[in-house]
């Protein structure tokens, strides 16, 4: 929790922030945040890439930071409540094996399969690939985990374990 409480930072990476169980992500961010600024000047950036554990296994802390990072909700000084901006990318955007030779994500199934950077033809789009995976899962708990680990939306990323309806 108490890391980086005095050193000025230009960059802070909190990898897999949605999986912290032993420490408080919110408390850690409260301590680290001032190290990225000096007065009103921002000198450093924070990056918190993560998939999300169950809410009771560290996910709730990241969800709180996510909710406090909404650019539509700012304080009187113009900052989000967390000082961060949230950013979400669906699993199917930029997924390995679905990038064409020009660096573009092949999300929708193409009429004419493009060549992937690895050399194979991309015959199905990445979104359809993940929809096919989901369609093959009949166990609701497994489907819930699949959606949380490979989310199409932030709502899926922060799914609670009780949200097990397959409809």
Feature-to-residue mapping (PLM):
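Structural recognition of the conserved hydrophobic beta-strand(s) that form the central parallel beta-sheet
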Residues: 42-51
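Short strand->helix junction
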Residues: 2, 19-20
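Short, conserved "post-DEAD/DEAH" coupling segment immediately C-terminal to helicase motif II
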Residues: 23-42
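Walker B catalytic acidic pair
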Residues: 13-19
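Proline-rich low-complexity regions
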Residues: 16, 34-35, 90
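Conserved P-loop NTPase catalytic core
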Residues: 1, 7-12, 25-26, 50-167
């Amino acid at each position: 929790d108490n890391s980086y409480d005095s050193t000025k930072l230009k960059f802070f990476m909190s990898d897999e922030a949605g999986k912290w169980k032993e420490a408080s992500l919110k408390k850690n961010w409260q301590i680290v945040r001032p190290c990225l600024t000096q007065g009103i000047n921002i000198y450093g950036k924070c990056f918190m890439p993560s998939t999300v554990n169950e809410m009771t296994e560290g996910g709730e802390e990241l969800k709180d930071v996510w909710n406090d990072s909404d650019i539509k909700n700012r304080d009187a000084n113009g900052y989000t409540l967390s000082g961060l901006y949230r950013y979400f990318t669906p699993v199917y955007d930029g997924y390995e094996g679905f990038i064409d030779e020009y660096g573009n994500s092949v999300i929708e199934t193409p009429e004419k399969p493009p060549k992937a950077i690895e050399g194979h033809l991309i015959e199905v789009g990445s979104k359809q690939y993940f929809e096919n995976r989901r369609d093959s899962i009949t166990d609701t708990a497994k489907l819930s985990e699949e959606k949380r680990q490979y989310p199409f939306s932030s709502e899926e990323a922060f799914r609670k374990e009780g949200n097990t309806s397959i409809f």
